[in-house]
Every structure is written in C-alpha cells, then in structure tokens.
Amino acid sequence: MSNEGSREESREPEAREGKSDEIFEVEKILAHKVTDNLLVLQVRWLGYGADEDTWEPEEDLQECASEVVAEYYKKLKVTDKTELIELLQKQIKKNKSQKSKKRSKTVSDHESNHDSDGSYGTPKTSKKSKKSAKNETPVSSKVPKVPTKAALKSYEATVSGPVAPNNAKKAAMEVRDTRRNWLDEESSDDEAETTAPLSDVEKIASKVKVVKAVEEKAEEPVKRPSTPPKPREVVIKKDPSESPVASASSVIPTSKRKSINAETSNGRQRTLAPPVIVKDETTWTVDGIARHTDVDNTKTKLILMTNSATGERKVVEGREAFELDGWALAKYLLDRCEF
C-alpha cells in the first residue's frame, strides 16, 4: 500500500496551498505516445491548467478513469490499447517511408543539379581550351615543322602496312610520295599564313599567263657567222653598141659594185645604200590579258600594262590600251599568233 501511495503521489500534480486534501480527477486525455514499450497518455486534471498536465500509464488510468480512456479511444476510432499501438506503428512506418522518399528526392535533385552544372561547365572549359589553343597558334606557327626520323619511320610503317615482296618497290614509292605531299602541305600552310593580301593590279597580274619563252626568243639578237660570206658575182647585160672595154668589165664583184653609181633605164643615177634599221622602242609593254566579269555579269577583257620608264602599272580595257601604246598591244598579239 505504501508503494501504491507513493505511485499516486508521483503521478498527481502538486497540490496548491490550502488544497492538500483535494481529490484529483481526470478531466480529459489530450494525447498519447509509447515510451519504453509502454503506452502513456497525456492527462488534463480537473481544475488545473495546461502547465499541470502529466503523462500517465494507460493501465493506471484504466483503474481510476476508464470512462475517460474509453471516450478517448472512441475519438481515435479504436477499441483498446492494442489497436492504438498498431495504429501508432503504422503511423511510424508511414512517417519513415515519407522521410526516406523525401531524402531520396532531395539526393536525386542534388545529383541532377550537379550533373547540369557539370554539363554546363564542360563547354566553358572547351571554349577556354579553344581560346588557349588559338592564342598558342601564332607561336607554334613561327617554329619550323621538322619531322623527326622516328616520326617518319612510324608514318612509313602506318602507311605501308604489310606489303608483298613483289610490291615492295611500289610501296616504297607510295611512302616517298606521301612524305613529299606531307612536307609540301606544311610548307604551303606556312606560306599561306605569311602572304599579305594582294591589290587589284596584283590579282589581275596573277591571272595573266605571260609566255616568257616567246618574248625572249623574239628579243634574242641574230647571230652572224664568224667568217663573212664570199661576194657573189653579178652579171650585167649591156647593149652591144657600147665600147668593148665596158663589156669586158661587165663582171664586177658585189663588194666593189656598192661604190659605183648604177644607171637606171631612164638615165638617172642612184647610189646603193644599206637599209636603215628602225629600232623597236615602246614606252609601254603588255604583261598579259585576262577575262573579267563585272557585277552585271558582263564579260570583258582587261589588259595589264607596265611603263618601262617609270615602272607604273595599269589595268585597262582594249581601247585605252591601244591609245596608250598601240604598237605594244599589236606586238603582244603578233608574238602569240600562229600562221
């Protein structure tokens, strides 16, 4: 009995001053929980406030306030303590599953955000790498590209592959051609990087195909024989009425005859003088002729001419070229005509 009295004292609220002999009654049950495998209920005591609420075992309340406990069970739609415990276990499992779902969802969202950040991050790095590569290209272009012997050997091995004994010579020639093409491509790339933009006159000049061999052949001086040719004998027929001395001297060498005055049929005399050689001097020279199509799709021919005195270059049409130096244009065309 002493144990029960101490137990009741522990679960009952402290009595106020002047109310030590009061009887404590359960007004209502507010909540429930399970602690140490024991179902306890939160009790509101009659005549006391919320500060005086206590948690009491369900078994003890069944002894002194079974009606209040039954009303609480009815409110929860359960019949007894076992159903209430099962309901609590279901709620606990449900809460755990919801928490696990929330955790998995947050983890998946975090991973997706991380993946998206990574996917967006990769192009930046690639752009940076491209920019760095662009910045490094001028330095690398200045360095001459000289393939090493090991690189050439490996390149030969990859190109040639397994070759039959009969085709060994052919394979060696193919390797040599590929190596030559490779070196030519590298040299052409270096030249393309160093070449400056051409002007309009230079563009027209690049289209013109000047036949230098024909011009050089035309300008070559005529080679004369080292030994002078023998003078030919010229027979001059004269009238028989003339003196015999003159008829006897009718055969005269050509070298002596140049200094003698020749008599024509009408009695006049003339001297035989060497022909005058006119020098072919032109101020302008024609470098070439190229086809040109303008914006209106009109096809014309442009002529590239150079002033031999000043070095000035002009790109003109046919009429203007003729006005500048007609003989230079005619000479250019005659050198290229074949009859």
Swiss-Prot record:
Keywords (A to Z) from UniProt: Chromosome, DNA-binding, Nucleus
Region of interest: Disordered: 1-21, 91-199, 215-272
GO BP: heterochromatin formation; negative regulation of gene expression
Record carries keyword Nucleus: yes
Residue stretches of biased makeup (Low complexity): 242-251
Gene3D superfamilies: 2.40.50.40
Residue ranges, compositional bias (Basic residues): 91-105
Database matches in InterPro entries: Chromo-like_dom_sf (IPR016197), Chromo/chromo_shadow_dom (IPR000953), Chromo_domain (IPR023780), Chromodomain_CS (IPR023779), Heterochromatin_chromo-domain (IPR051219)
One cellular component term from this protein's GO annotations in UniProt: nucleus
Matching Pfam families: Chromo (PF00385)
Protein localization: Chromosome; Nucleus
Chromo domain residues: 24-84
Disulfide bridge positions per record: none
Biased composition (Acidic residues): 184-193
GO MF annotation list: chromatin binding; DNA binding; methylated histone binding
Primary site of residence: nucleus
Residue ranges with Basic and acidic residues bias: 106-117, 171-183, 230-241
Changes seen on gene knockout: Expression of unc-4 in all 6 VC motor neurons in contrast to wild-type expression which is only detected in the vulval VC neurons, leading to hyperinhibition of HSN neuron activity and egg-laying defects. RNAi-mediated knockdown in an spr-5 mutant background suppresses progressive sterility and prevents accumulation of histone H3 'Lys-4' dimethylation.
Tissue specificity comment: Expressed in every cell of the embryo (at protein level). In adults, expressed predominantly in the head region and the germline.
Top-level taxon of the source organism: Eukaryota
Function: Specifically recognizes and binds methylated 'Lys-9' of histone H3 (H3K9me), with highest preference for trimethylated 'Lys-9' (H3K9me3) followed by dimethylated 'Lys-9' (H3K9me2) followed by monomethylated 'Lys-9' (H3K9me1). Plays a role in maintaining correct unc-4 expression in the VC motor neurons where unc-4 is expressed in the vulval but not in the non-vulval VC neurons.
The name this protein goes by in its record: Chromo domain-containing protein cec-3
Organism annotation: Caenorhabditis elegans
